[in-house]
A protein has these predicted regions:
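TRNA-recognition modules of translation machinery and tRNA-sensing kinases, especially anticodon-binding
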Residues: 1-164
Length: 164
């Protein structure tokens, strides 16, 4: 079988020129948010399917690229439900992984905790013109700060970053 030269529908190759621009923008974002006290974190791109799936269903359920179980855990022929063959999925945004990360590590983190995340996310929806199934997302959050001043700080940090 011949090699398909085009990426899968909804995916994109990034050429060196665009990668240089992307790297520069990422460095400006990290530098600016860092001056506001945001700390970079990284979470796995694969999350437990139970964390990604909401109990109410909804639109997010349709966004998940589901990953089949492997090895002894996978028995497709005997499976009667999706849960029997799927145990994880690719993250569709950075919020769910952040919640899991914070709940697992809160005792080791400062309070309030200012998180900066940048990473690829995947959405299993039908790509429309100019949209992709894989793209980079940037997210800042302040956890453990009950006042509305945190919201103002998020806005100030973002407008400062976008102004550069």
């Amino acid at each position: 079988m011949a090699l398909s030269k085009k990426p899968t529908t909804g995916m994109k190759d990034i050429l060196p020129e665009e990668m240089q621009i992307r790297d520069y923008v990422i460095s400006v974002i990290k530098d600016t948010y860092g001056k506001f006290g945001f700390t970079s974190i990284e979470t796995p791109c694969v999350e437990n399917i139970a964390n990604l799936s909401s109990k109410q269903g909804g639109d997010n359920e349709k966004l998940i690229f589901k990953i089949l179980k492997r090895g002894e855990k996978l028995n497709v022929a005997a499976a009667t439900t999706e849960e029997e063959v799927v145990d994880s999925g690719l993250r569709y945004d950075l919020t769910v992984p952040l919640v899991r990360y914070y709940s697992n590590n809160a005792a080791s983190l400062p309070s309030p905790f200012k998180a900066l995340q940048m990473g690829n996310v995947w959405r299993a929806d039908r790509p429309q013109r100019g949209r992709y199934r894989q793209f980079m997302q940037c997210d800042i959050d302040i956890l453990g700060e009950p006042s509305n001043l945190a919201e103002i700080e998020l806005i100030l940090a973002t407008t400062t970053t976008l102004g550069k």
